[in-house]
Amino acid sequence: MAQKLTLEEKQGIQRMLLDYAARYASQAKAANSLHGVTSPGTFNAVVNGKFERISDEMFLRIKAAVGSGKSEGWQICQTSAFKDVETLLADAQQYQNVSWIVAPAGIGKTTAAFQYSKTHKNVFVLGCSEDMHKADFVEELAKKIGIRNEGLTVRATLTRIVDELVKMNRPLLVFDEGDKLTDSVMYYFISLYNALEDKCGIVFLSTPFIQKRITKGLKLDKKGYEELYSRIGRKFVPLSGVTEYEVNAICRNNGLSDDKAIASVIRESVELRNSQMEFDLRRVKKSIHKQLRIAAAPRL
């Protein structure tokens, strides 16, 4: 049987929810963005400290939806790539421009985007997937922004999204793993851009695969590709890779100080590609966890 949450743990989740709500124009919009996770009534009860009728399961669902997204106790290290993503997001939000950031998987793009959204208002990060249809894309975007779209058509929902965004102070849309979107969904970006030009920043994050896809689409004169390429400024913004020095810093920030253990993490996490050392931060994290467990094991 699972252990019951303490009052202190519930208050911690309440603080997470309050921090989450502070990123929206109103608590009502924050509650709408959690549609499917919790009801407005439950949202208000937790915010106001009325915990009596809220189940532990609901508290944990709220925590999963609004929490930091990082493992308990894991310290994020601001690598060069992390800082570059934050700088590009800040520029897009400040000047309402559009860019497409590309870097290999596991470099920390998503983490940087979510960390930025936690400390800046009107920033909405939408995770993209290959099975997203137009209706899914628009519905998820509406939910992120805090719009209830029951009874609305896809086109009407898109209009509501645009109307809501243009009323905000420097809104920013971040489409994570944008290369996974199908062509039909990408066409919606063109419609969004046309309606939001100079009114909303837009940033895509993806692997470099998108460059090949766009180049091929341009050669084949595929519908929408020329307009899409034009709207991202006809270029992709690459990020620098994670260095051995940064992996060392991540190890030390997360409690691993033994030089031999750190060397093991580096060996297990490195991959040679085009004669260059590349590190996947997911592998780094897994290897650090392994070394910490080895260090904590009782010695016979």
What is each stretch, according to the model?
Residues 120-130:
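Conserved catalytic segments around the Walker B and adjacent sensor/switch elements
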Residues 94-115, 129-130:
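Walker A/P-loop nucleotide-binding motif
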